[in-house]
Swiss-Prot record:
This is Large ribosomal subunit protein uL10. Forms part of the ribosomal stalk, playing a central role in the interaction of the ribosome with GTP-bound translation factors. It comes from the Bacteria. The lineage of its organism: Bacteria, Bacillati, Cyanobacteriota, Cyanophyceae, Synechococcales. Belongs to the universal ribosomal protein uL10 family. Keywords: Ribonucleoprotein, Ribosomal protein, RNA-binding, rRNA-binding. It comes from Synechocystis sp. (strain ATCC 27184 / PCC 6803 / Kazusa).
Length: 173
């Protein structure tokens, strides 16, 4: 038995609601995955602000109607489609998916959409290779700390060099 009209409307509204808060979507082919593997993928994405949504392509197209920012996604909606909706840590979520893909070897990354622009598989993987927010903050803090250390050593070196010069003059006499 197929879905009822009310059930389809619920799925469409759920998908629209997911897209409202999303920064990026990644479209994958999930053919061959078991329910346990899909649950594993969802569990890997959840702590990073990601969601894995599986819905019929027709219902996703209806949910996309009137949403210009997500319209480029339609080109990827063929076959068995799962949509990874990423809200927070884009790089971390993509890394989690790539690790899942490496572990299962069953999914295929089709592409993605970011800020209304269609992304190829290479584009999505490049975003995944970017450092995370925490790593960037650590690099910035390390750079600031190194700069402060160099300034402190420079300030300390001026009186020390004067003292060495005076000591050399005293030793000479």
């Amino acid at each position: 038995m197929g879905r009822t009209r009310e059930n389809k409307a619920t799925v469409i509204s759920d998908v629209q609601e997911l897209f409202q808060d999303a920064q990026m979507t990644v479209i994958i082919d999930y053919q061959g995955l078991t329910v346990a593997e899909i649950t594993d993928l969802r569990n890997r994405l959840r702590p990073l602000g990601g969601t894995c949504k599986i819905a019929k392509n027709t219902l996703v197209r209806r949910a996309l109607a009137g949403q210009e920012a997500w319209s480029p996604m339609e080109e990827f909606l063929t076959g068995t489609t799962a949509i990874l909706v990423l809200k927070e840590d884009l790089g971390g979520a993509i890394k989690a998916y790539k690790k899942f893909q490496k572990d299962t070897k069953k999914t295929e990354l089709r592409g993605g959409v970011l800020e209304g622009k269609s992304l190829t598989q290479a584009d999505v993987e490049a975003i995944g290779d970017l450092p995370s927010k925490e790593q960037l903050m650590g690099q910035i803090a390390g750079g600031i700390n190194a700069l402060a250390t160099k300034i402190a050593l420079g300030i300390k070196e001026v009186p020390a060099s004067v003292a060495r010069g005076l000591q050399a003059h005293v030793d000479k006499e």
